[in-house]
Amino acid sequence: MNSYWLNIYKPRGISSAKLVSMVKKILGKEVKVGHAGTLDVEAEGILPLAVGEATKLIQLLIDAKKTYIFTVKFGTKTDSGDYAGTVIATKDYIPSQEEAYNVCSKFIGNVTQIPPAFSALKVNGVRAYKLAREGKEVELKPRNITIYNLKCLNFDEKNATASYYTECSKGTYIRTLAEDLALSLQSLGFVIELRRTQVGIFKEENAIRIKSPDEITKNFLEEKSIKIEAILDDILVLDATDSQAQQIKYGQKCLFNYEEDFRRLSKFAYREEFEENTERSTAAYTLVREDANTGLTYKLPLEVELSVSLLWVRYKGNLLAIGSLNKSCFNSLRVFNLL
């Protein structure tokens, strides 16, 4: 079975699950397909799909940063937080253009959000949106998110709307962000347009747009496929020997030779991820290495007990496993059947 990613652009009016079903119909019901983060039915934009063994990497994409462009209608609140909901409150005050632009700085950084009642989160095993549609009260716990960037792109005084761009962490609800923005401006608001423009490495410029499954063939999707390792480009990689690969395949812990393998790891030593996730012991001997990008020289312990929270192992050019390196030992998190 082929394993790869598809960069799909979800149109408005279709659920993420329905889109997965459409692709499965094209590829074959026996093919495993999953999506990396639900998009609301009323939203459009990037919905990465994992095919085959790529489904084992979905969590990495769910954890990735995402970018959105959304438009807020001021002066009105709906029960769902978007245009598909029922109006439940109105307010005469509409913020000015200056206020709509200046409010952004208040939301950049670590933020606490209460997810909307109309969401796919579960309450006692039941989807919150199902309870909300039945008129039942839904209480969801606040969650911590991060807004890396937020800026106003356009303000329309006549229509009382403002469009925003945001880069945010996983778990961010744009409908809640829009409502919180409006409240901060002493008004009310709901989302009238929502577009996800990027998820990790997947961008809208080269996305596949599916209108009908009859228009797209399996060969077309496979031609547009993205290699499974593409989302691992910024993560450390080790090449396994035959014996190491055998151990990993059988779920055994695998030892790596540090004098040899650390030299290979050192190619990536100056990436930010490596610096953050590495613990170094004191050693009498050091490996002196110059970073080609900065020209700076680093002295690193050669006999090092290295710990990396996430890396992947490659065998004969193919993805074998992802996992962690704890001192001298590789512990697999996922093993892939790609050989």
Swiss-Prot record:
The keyword Isomerase applies. SUPFAM superfamilies: Pseudouridine synthase (SSF55120). One of its GO terms (biological process) is tRNA pseudouridine synthesis. InterPro entries: PsdUridine_synth_cat_dom_sf, PsdUridine_synth_N, RPE1, tRNA_psdUridine_synth_TruB, TruB_C. The active site is at 40 (nucleophile). One of its GO terms (molecular function) is tRNA pseudouridine(55) synthase activity. It comes from the Bacteria. It is an enzyme of class 5 (isomerase). It catalyses: uridine(55) in tRNA = pseudouridine(55) in tRNA. Its EC number is 5.4.99.25. Keywords: Isomerase, tRNA processing. Belongs to the pseudouridine synthase TruB family. Type 1 subfamily. Responsible for synthesis of pseudouridine from uracil-55 in the psi GC loop of transfer RNAs. This is tRNA pseudouridine synthase B. It comes from Rickettsia felis (strain ATCC VR-1525 / URRWXCal2) (Rickettsia azadi). The gene is truB.
